[in-house]
Amino acid sequence: MGERFEGLENLNDECKVKLFGCRMRAPGSGTGGHESIEYRLLILEENAEMVCRQRYRTILDYSSRGHGSMGLKHDEMTNGNVSAPFITASELRQYIYGSPIRSKTRVTEDKFRIIPNSRQLLITRVFYPRRTSMNLHGTFPKNYQSSDRRVSITMCLPSYLLADISDSWADIDGWLTQTERHLMATSFHVVETQDNFVTLVNKLLIPALRSCHEIPRLFLYPQDNIDFIHTWFKDVFNWIELKEGTKLSFLPFLIAKTLIEYRDDPQESECHRIVITSGNLVIANKLVFILGGLLKPRYDGEMKIMITPVSTPTPSNHLMPPSMNGSNESSYHSSSNSHTPSKLKIPATINEHRPSRPRYSSTENIHVQSRTMDIPIVKSDQSPFSTSRGWKIPSSYRSATSSVSISSDESLAEVIQPSSLKSTTSIPFQNFSSSLSNQLYSSSYGSWFNGSITGSFTNSNPLSNGTSNMATFSSSFKKNNISSIFQSNSPTAGTDSWERPENNTGLNPNITLQRTASNSSLRHMLTPYQQQLISPSTNSEYDEYPWFGATNNAGGATVGTSSETVGSQQPVLLQGAHMDTTTLLDSIRTSNNNGAYTFPLKNVGFDRDCSSLDHHKLLTSCFEEIFEGDIDANKVTTMVPCSDIAVHIHSKQEDSEGVTSHPRVVIDVDIPGTTISKYPEELLPRYTMYLSHFNPFFKLQAIPATNEIENKIVHGLKRDFISEKCDVSKTLFISMRSRSIKEIVVRKTTSINTPSNSSNQDPRNKSKGSMLKQKIKKVFSNGTCTGRVTPVLNNCVAFVEAALMSAMSLYSDPTIDKKYRDERILKIFLAVAHYNVDEV
């Protein structure tokens, strides 16, 4: 945690709105610009003599900016760019111990407070050493004599962390407990063991505070927000169409597993999290948004939408997302009256080849009246083609001037131009050096990366151990599905190879691509600048690996592309599709008058930081309207964040006797039934986006795939027993590279048969007779369920399949009224989100 969090720079505005509810600012602006948290650790001991001059003894006084006692300048302690005055240890004693008159009870006190005029806060534990405070070896320190001495452990931190103290209190309490145990183990002789205490701070406390202060958390939209529900179903359909291929089993199984075991808040004795590993943040964030739409607790307050101006795209530039005004004068309206352009395609049915031209090169739209969602479709003169084999190297590139060697296996190598690198100046080719064969479209998921996987897999039942038939859902979905592709310009359609395209790549047109026996790549023929561009793009979904939507029709396989891009070609119906072009267009558009798809989600009308929502502006505006003199008649203002409290402001009225009354404020509290609904919490749950490394303090996250990730997760699960004080900690581990799902469980067990003084037991667990047992089990792999499938999970998977099919039928039927469709979609989503095992 020494480095600052940097992850928002690679996200577009639409992804930020989906994940965070607003266009989050770049890293640094929201974290205060602090590279690290500076602290001061102070351990003091107080004896029982009130009149003694040597009443206090300093055991440890350490500062992160130097060595020894503070190690700073003598007159200041620096916190980032803000200088805080230096506070002597004698002055801190007064804040730590307070009055010298003690209470009769010998209790442990945990407290925190801000030191006036110092921009610092104190976190303190004051305790009496007693025999229940065992050390690390489960025994009491030697030569210890019970006395009235009081020991204090104090952490001095910058005051800007005040809002994060309460959120991190479980981790702070765990750090204080571990520090107390280490202190008892040393018999209060800390000079030789100072590094141990500093290590505890750097491993347990500082990472927890920085995680709460710097890493943005997901905003879980209200469960009845129709714009969010439309966006959620679109992402689900896009995922199924572009990522599932012929076996529609991965996502339904993952949703069912999440609903049953990971949706609700865990019990006090249990702690769980969801971790996604992927090499591409676009794919990972899509899955984070899908799973986050099912988790709890959700925001339950009134939402106001902030309207921002929309910039008009030009043919020469890419479409830039509208920027957030950030001014206090922003207006708030309902989300149905605002439109912002989007790069998100409508659900599930648009497969496209990478266009070789810059996006939005043409601005002519096709307007089609329909009942579902609108999407901008751009005309083009480019003709499509379909193929049943892999892509070949363009033969027209062959020349004698230069050559590039590609490995000569029995299979073809893929050279694909990523959409994220489309440019008219310099676009290198991206080489997929994995072995491809004609079994590509029939092999199991992840076979590109596992050379040991041979043979082909048929469309068998993915949940072969007693679960519902996924193949039925697959064929049913494909029947109702609308498949189309955006393809590049090709003079000859229906051929198995590309003709020579336009030379807009920035490469030498005389480069020859030939098959040789060498293993060299394209890199040695490129300039250093072009080699830099070959690195994986954060905006391309091909970087993970393209899951081809294979079909058994004569038309062959289709190539899915990123759902984050909108091409400039006209969609063409695939061979073997079950709908004509009119039905295709009608099934993926709404009945908006302008006929253009608009991203349904907008900026929510309140500020937020990384960990919480800020309703200061809305509350201030509400109270200003209450107390201002000139008030509109019968004006109603709804306070945020609580949707169950409404403030009604009535203007001056005359009663029956002609007496004019002053404006009155009536607060109506809606109490459903006999239970009072909870106020929406400002603090957001610990769910976050794609991070550069595993963070054990978050319950939902996506990270890059590494070899050590499972060990890090197990280590994070063991830390839960310190901070959360739980008995079971488990993680749902999702690997996008191998399309597998694992469950990692660490459980605390009590050893009954083993004596407490046994030598083969962990010394830390001798006094309590407990030990930790870990288990890693694979629950889903190669498109099938590999573990034991319970009837509860089987029923939930079938329910998710039926719900997705019902939603798909509503979106694909152009005759359904928009209002009726919204009502039905809302009921379907609520049925999925509130799936109850006991009611099935």
From Swiss-Prot:
Where is each dDENN FNIP1/2-type domain found? 731-836
- Give the UniProt keywords, A-Z: Amino-acid transport, Protein transport, Transport
A GO BP annotation: amino acid transport
Q: Which GO terms describe its molecular function?
A: GTPase activator activity
The similarity comment for this entry is: Belongs to the LST4 family.
Bias (Low complexity): 323-338
Residue ranges the record marks as coiled coil: none
uDENN FNIP1/2-type domain segment(s): 34-223
Q: What is the organism of origin for this protein? A: Candida glabrata (strain ATCC 2001 / BCRC 20586 / JCM 3761 / NBRC 0622 / NRRL Y-65 / CBS 138) (Yeast)
Q: Tell me where the signal peptide lies.
A: none
Q: Mind telling me which GO cellular component terms the entry cites?
A: FNIP-folliculin RagC/D GAP; vacuolar membrane
Region Disordered, as annotated, extends over 314-343, 488-509, 752-771
Q: Which residues form the cDENN FNIP1/2-type domain?
A: 231-723
* Job description of the protein: Involved in extracellular amino acid uptake. Required for the protein trafficking from the Golgi to the plasma membrane.
Q: Which gene encodes it?
A: LST4
Name of this protein: Protein LST4
